[in-house]
Regions:
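Polybasic low-complexity intrinsically disordered regions
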Residues: 2, 7, 55-56, 74, ...
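Alpha-helical support elements that line or immediately flank enzyme active sites
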Residues: 58-70
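N-terminal core-binding DNA-recognition domain of tyrosine recombinases/integrases
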Residues: 47-51, 70-72, 110-111
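Helix-centered, glycine/charged polyanion-binding patches within enzymatic domains
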Residues: 3-10, 208, 212-213, 218-292
Length: 315
């Protein structure tokens, strides 16, 4: 049996609950742990003649901590030694903290079996069952995730799977996360491409097919897609684009203003991922590894956005 250390006793007797403790307590309560673990346990190494693997739930909890706090594998190991609230969330004591290689290997395990996309699908279904993701309308949008553009690295070159794109007057190098969300900003579809792929090229992949309305900025303005949507009875609420040499008329400006009231709701999820959790730059080389992280981030962001509804729900 684990004997309580001095730090354990001091932690138990402290008076103030920190923001970190409050956040981790909320996420502990609302994450559907059994559902999330089910696909992992089918693939996770079983105890055998060799060293017994650390429990999948412990490793998944540590992986989530990395997403929320933007921690590298060595940084995660150090934080588990330093921060009691993280150890408690992970379910480990100070004598059984996994090292950075174990943390790295778990991430590779998730990537190898495409499990983070499954985690995203599980959370999306979980919220849909509770009417916390709606199917009536979809907002499409994309955000750029920067990658290092310098060649001052071990390979002496930039990541060949990342590309550049121009936004306004500024060039960006990296990848894009394209999403489809419901009209409250909860994400149901995620597609990751290099940054050079135009938003409209993956629009269809960001729809679930049961929409009654589609919202998007002028990057998605496409007459062919518009006619296709209208022929299916879908309300096309994509922002209208001024023709070359002409300004939008009053009716078009009014249309865009009304659509923007709904479309703006998708910015909340980007704000959570980029500003609250600090995911502005890719952490790994290659699209596949970074896409795996993106699926996880949007799954967790969906749950975070509806944490109060989940916490107050019966059962």
């Amino acid at each position: 049996m684990h004997q309580a250390s001095f730090s354990d006793l001091a932690y138990a007797n402290k008076k103030k609950t920190t923001r970190k403790e409050k956040f981790l307590g909320e996420m502990e309560e609302i994450l559907p742990w059994k559902r999330l673990l089910k696909p992992l346990l089918k693939k996770y190494p079983k105890p055998g003649n060799g060293r017994c693997p650390i429990a999948a739930e412990v490793m998944l909890r540590i992986y989530f901590l990395q997403q929320w706090y933007g921690l590298s594998d060595p940084g995660m190991e150090d934080s588990l030694y330093d921060i009691e609230s993280m150890r408690r969330f992970a379910g480990v004591d100070i004598d059984h903290i996994p090292d950075e290689t174990t943390i790295l290997n778990f991430r590779h395990f998730l990537e190898a079996h495409q499990l983070t996309e499954k985690l995203f699908r599980i959370t999306e279904q979980y919220l849909s069952e509770r009417d916390l993701i709606l199917s009536e309308g979809t907002i499409v949008d994309a955000t750029i995730i920067s990658a290092p553009s310098s060649t001052k690295n071990q390979e002496k070159r930039r990541d060949p799977e990342m590309k550049q794109t121009k936004k306004g007057n500024t060039w960006h190098f990296g990848m894009k996360a394209h999403i489809g969300s419901d009209t409250r900003g909860r994400v149901h579809s995620v597609v990751v491409t290099d940054a050079s792929v135009h938003d409209s090229q993956v629009m269809a992949d960001c729809l679930h097919g049961e929409e009654q309305a589609v919202y998007g900025d002028k990057a998605y303005a496409n007459e062919e897609e518009k006619h296709k949507a209208k022929s299916q009875g879908i309300d096309w609420r994509v922002n209208r684009k001024a023709k070359r040499g002409k300004k939008l008329n009053c009716a078009d400006r009014s249309f865009n203003k009304k659509s923007n009231r709904v479309r703006a709701r998708v910015e909340h999820v980007f704000g959570i991922i980029k500003h609250l959790w600090g995911y502005r730059k890719v952490r790994y080389r290659g699209l596949a590894k970074n896409a795996a992280q993106v699926f996880t981030l949007f799954a967790l962001a969906n749950l975070y956005m509806v944490r109060r509804e989940l916490a107050s729900a019966p059962g």
